[in-house]
């Protein structure tokens, strides 16, 4: 999993797993999902990310070794 934040556009991109994207679905005006050929979510994009969450703090829980 990769998290990327783009300060210039206030966009948070969360890649759940590397995959070829075959479809993009808009959940709302600020959130999009990227789907692979099987329809599984492989990435999520959040526009206006800093207004939706406190990006100064990231907590990871239950991370498997």
Describe each model-derived feature in a short phrase.
Residues 1-65:
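Small, basic N-terminal interaction modules of short regulatory proteins
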């Amino acid at each position: 999993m990769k998290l990327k934040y783009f300060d210039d556009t206030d966009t948070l991109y969360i890649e759940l797993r590397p995959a070829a994207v075959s479809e993009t679905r808009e959940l709302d005006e600020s959130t999009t999902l990227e789907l692979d050929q099987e329809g599984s979510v492989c990435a999520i994009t959040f526009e206006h990310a800093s207004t939706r969450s406190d990006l100064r703090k990231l907590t990871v829980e239950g991370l498997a070794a």
